Design a protein with these regions (language model features):
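Low-complexity repeat regions of mature extracellularly deployed or surface/particle-associated proteins
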Residues: 1-141
Length: 141
């Protein structure tokens, strides 16, 4: 599913596997805004699920789910006219899952889940600082 309402969006989406017929990738995207730069990739074997709902403008989002593990991501950004900068990478053979909901002022958010050990992460954040907020999390071996 792809639903883009607005203009000046830059999107670079790709999905591919290494030839395993049993691996699946699924992506869903809903922007409803303008001036977004979004790069999403889901690579290698292993099931990958990704949902994204922006409802905003001036966002930069980079997401890369790779490796042979099953990875799940559900991301929602909503913040009026403020900007977000989000970088997420879930890699490795472990099953990694993340749910992120960012609201309020600009948030520089980084999440790295990696390795063979299963990792899960959930955050529901509203940035109340006009200068912005920053969150950086790394999990795995």
């Amino acid at each position: 599913m792809v639903d883009i309402d607005g203009s000046t969006n830059t999107l670079n989406l790709s999905q591919r596997n290494d030839g395993n017929a049993n691996s699946e990738h699924y992506m869903s995207l809903d922007l409803d805004s303008s001036q977004n730069v979004i790069t999403m990739q889901q690579l290698n074997d292993g099931d990958k699920f990704l949902f994204l709902d922006v409802d905003n403008n001036n966002n930069t989002v980079d997401i890369n789910q790779s490796g042979s593990g099953s990875h799940y991501l559900d991301l929602h950004l909503e913040s009026g006219s403020y900007a977000h900068d989000v970088d997420i990478s879930q890699t490795g053979t472990g099953s990694h899952g993340a749910r992120i909901n960012l609201d309020g002022y600009s948030t520089d958010f980084d999440l790295q889940q990696q390795g063979s050990t299963d990792q899960n992460y959930s955050v529901d954040m509203t940035c109340g600082t006009a200068n912005g907020c920053a969150v950086s999390t790394t999990q795995g071996n």
